[in-house]
Swiss-Prot record:
<dbReference type="GO" id="GO:0050661">
    <property type="term" value="F:NADP binding"/>
</dbReference>
<feature type="binding site">
    <location>
        <begin position="112"/>
        <end position="114"/>
    </location>
    <ligand>
        <name>substrate</name>
    </ligand>
</feature>
<feature type="active site" description="Nucleophile">
    <location>
        <position position="50"/>
    </location>
</feature>
<dbReference type="Pfam" id="PF00745">
    <property type="entry name" value="GlutR_dimer"/>
</dbReference>
<dbReference type="Pfam" id="PF05201">
    <property type="entry name" value="GlutR_N"/>
</dbReference>
<dbReference type="GO" id="GO:0008883">
    <property type="term" value="F:glutamyl-tRNA reductase activity"/>
</dbReference>
<protein>
    <recommendedName>
        <fullName>Glutamyl-tRNA reductase</fullName>
        <ecNumber>1.2.1.70</ecNumber>
    </recommendedName>
</protein>
<comment type="pathway">
    <text>Porphyrin-containing compound metabolism; protoporphyrin-IX biosynthesis; 5-aminolevulinate from L-glutamyl-tRNA(Glu): step 1/2.</text>
</comment>
<dbReference type="InterPro" id="IPR015896">
    <property type="entry name" value="4pyrrol_synth_GluRdtase_dimer"/>
</dbReference>
<keyword id="KW-0560">Oxidoreductase</keyword>
<keyword id="KW-0521">NADP</keyword>
<dbReference type="InterPro" id="IPR015895">
    <property type="entry name" value="4pyrrol_synth_GluRdtase_N"/>
</dbReference>
<comment type="subunit">
    <text>Homodimer.</text>
</comment>
<feature type="binding site">
    <location>
        <position position="107"/>
    </location>
    <ligand>
        <name>substrate</name>
    </ligand>
</feature>
<feature type="binding site">
    <location>
        <position position="118"/>
    </location>
    <ligand>
        <name>substrate</name>
    </ligand>
</feature>
<comment type="similarity">
    <text>Belongs to the glutamyl-tRNA reductase family.</text>
</comment>
<dbReference type="InterPro" id="IPR018214">
    <property type="entry name" value="GluRdtase_CS"/>
</dbReference>
Length: 420
């Protein structure tokens, strides 16, 4: 079975393309089932975040095109559009790619920790769908171990830097002191929680949290002395916001140009800084055309993010060394799996010969034969039966002059010398 990783990320595809290829969490189990049934993949997992959509598959050699074609058809994408931004990683490269992603080495913000939780979620969805088998199961467990090792043994995780942090950093550049500002947070997931934490740490004046699930909004708002509102009441409160950060799982925009225009009129056109971290986007792109709106999406944050890379470069080099070692360790395990069916077949054959020889010995004992004689004959017969086929095959190899096969036989039987 061949390992295959393929997909798009923030480096290869714009947010406009990435939002076409995302998978809503509630659709992942059915999508995984469909992927396996239609493409012929034996194992599969899907990682879908704001910055990347990646598929990890175990499939037969030659099935690569089928699984990629499934992804294209599932989202109804034009072949040329997908081809321009799609990357593929087979086998050894697939393992390396997943380990790098889990360790934060392939993230927009180098070393960010949120991706590991997202990979664990992808693994859980695969388990739920029944598409995680022996190989992918082992790969994901190994990935979790390596990501933890990278965090423990390097400084890759020092200084809390993330897309949320980049958004707050940009807000500070625009407003300077945040004490007199009100931040309006849309959503209540991990990214919004991080943004709230960074805003609170940087002294933001007020925090409002809007979410479909009001209980989650209350839980988040209470942590930072803010207040919560249902998402449906967002238009009523938007005029209070100096800063808007949005990250929901909505498949359609939830904040349109008309709503923002009304909020600006109420604010007497005092500017609003908006960051749309969601993919698909929560805020209609046309909102950015308004004169008093400063709208940024995840791609726009790249410049801010780049400034934070320098402190983690040395740690990233250390992490790459750890990953190099662990890729080889995992591939050694994969290679041993090719021998498992052979080992099972050989042991099964040997066990059958053992049973037959043992049954024959028991009959002779029941007939009153001398036990020592029976044991001697049992050992003799079992040795002959076990060695009959290997001996015949070795003679045949010798007759054909197959030196490589004969050398392999020496290794298999652990014979480091023989007499001519």
């Amino acid at each position: 079975m061949q390992l295959l990783a393929f997909g798009v990320n923030h480096k290869t595809a714009s947010v406009a393309i990435r939002e076409q290829i995302t998978f809503a969490p509630e659709r992942l189990p059915s999508a995984l089932t469909e992927l396996v049934n239609r493409s012929g993949a034996k194992e599969a997992a899907i990682l879908s975040t704001c910055n990347r959509t990646e598929l990890y598959c175990g499939c037969a050699p030659g099935q690569q095109e089928a699984v990629i074609e499934w992804l294209r058809q599932y989202h109804g994408m034009e072949p040329k559009i997908l081809e321009t931004c799609l990357y593929t990683h087979p086998d050894h490269s697939a393992v390396r790619h997943l380990l790098r992603v889990a360790s934060g080495l392939d993230s927009m913000v180098l070393g960010e920790p949120q991706i590991l939780g997202q990979i664990k979620a992808a693994y859980s969805y695969g388990l739920e769908a029944g598409t995680i088998g022996r190989v992918l199961g082992r790969l994901f467990q190994h990935t979790f171990y390596v990501a933890k090792q990278v965090r423990t043994d390097t400084a890759i995780g020092t200084s809390p830097i993330s897309v949320a942090f980049a958004a707050v950093s940009l807000a500070k550049q625009i407003f300077g002191d945040l004490e007199s500002t009100t931040a309006f947070l849309i959503g209540a997931g991990e990214t919004i929680e991080l943004a709230a934490r960074h805003l609170f740490t940087n002294g933001v004046g007020h925090i409002i949290v809007a979410n479909r699930n009001l209980d989650k909004a209350y839980q988040l708002a209470n942590q930072f002395n803010g207040y919560a509102i249902p998402l449906a009441e967002m238009p009523k409160h938007l005029s209070e916001a100096d800063i808007v950060i949005s990250s929901t799982g909505s498949q359609l925009p939830i904040l349109g140009k008309g709503t923002v225009e009304r909020a600006l009129r109420i604010r007497k056109h005092r500017p609003i800084f908006m960051v749309d971290i969601a993919v698909p986007r929560d805020i209609e792109p046309e909102v950015g055309e308004l004169q008093d709106i400063y709208l940024y999406n995840v791609d726009d944050l790249q410049e801010v993010v780049q400034e934070n890379l320098r402190s983690r470069q040395a740690a990233a080099l250390q992490a790459e060394e750890i990953i190099d070692t662990q890729v080889e360790y995992f591939m050694d395990w994969v290679r041993t799996q090719d021998a498992v069916p052979v080992i099972c077949a050989v042991r099964q054959e040997a066990d059958q010969l053992r049973k037959e020889a043992l049954e024959k010995a028991r009959r002779r004992l029941a007939q009153g034969h001398d036990p020592n004689e029976v044991l001697t004959m049992l050992a003799h017969n079992l040795t002959n039966k076990l060695m009959h086929v290997p001996t015949r095959q070795l003679r045949s190899l010798g007759a054909t002059g197959d030196e490589l096969a004969l050398q392999a036989a020496l290794k298999i039987f652990d014979v480091d010398h023989f007499k001519a």
